[in-house]
């Protein structure tokens, strides 16, 4: 009698465990065949957009001769903006798996890659008139005039901005001096990423400025030319052989913003 009780208890326990397991598996019976379905979907980093804007702001002083032959000055700015926008769609993968009791497996994978780049550049220019030079030290008489020149040269590896301002009303003694200037560069980068807000922003700002007061003869790739007069007026240009070219009074600002969508 005790043997029968233990057998009944074991049978009931086995039946209960099988019922529980069947409920967890959630088998579907169709036409006498048992099917088990499993769908797995994953996304690998959606599209990322990069927007990069470069501003060249050149501030220069232009001499102005008034009607009473007095010479004064005015300040002007020349701004050149270059915007680079790049959108890249990284691969997006979706997996679907169907499994039957016959061990049949189907796998589907789709990948989309797209890249778009837009480049926009705008330039502001003014006219110029410069005096004739013939020697390293000389004397010349200039008619009261005002001249300003802003030139932008752009190719694959060099971008040059040259600004010139000269004006004299009397006989002046002008000497030309050549020295080398190394610009001071400061860089600041701020990065913020949040998986909960599904977005991240990466902004970096670098400012490059050069001083005309203390030239340093340390880098032959950066040439600065000064033309001094009795009133300490000067003409200076800084040319960097790399990817940047700025005037001595130019502020160079570069902003890079990254918009990224992060899937949870």
Curated annotation (Swiss-Prot):
Lipidation, GPI-anchor amidated aspartate type: 247
One of the GO BP terms on file: cell wall organization
Signal sequence, start to end: 1-23
Keyword Glycoprotein tagged: yes
Propeptide: 248-264
Compartments, as annotated in UniProt: Secreted, Cell wall; Membrane
Highest taxon in the source lineage: Eukaryota
Feature: compositional bias, Acidic residues: 93-104
UniProt topology in membrane: Lipid-anchor; GPI-anchor
Any coiled-coil regions, as ranges: none
Name of the featured protein: Protein DSE2
Region of interest called Disordered, as start-end residue ranges on this chain: 75-213
Keywords: Cell wall, Cell wall biogenesis/degradation, Glycoprotein, GPI-anchor, Lipoprotein, Membrane, Secreted, Signal
Regions of compositional bias (Low complexity) in chain numbering: 75-92, 105-147, 157-168, 178-211
Ranges annotated as spanning the membrane: none
Role this protein plays: Involved in pseudohyphal growth, cell wall metabolism and required for the separation of the mother and daughter cells.
Cellular-component GO terms for this entry: extracellular region; side of membrane
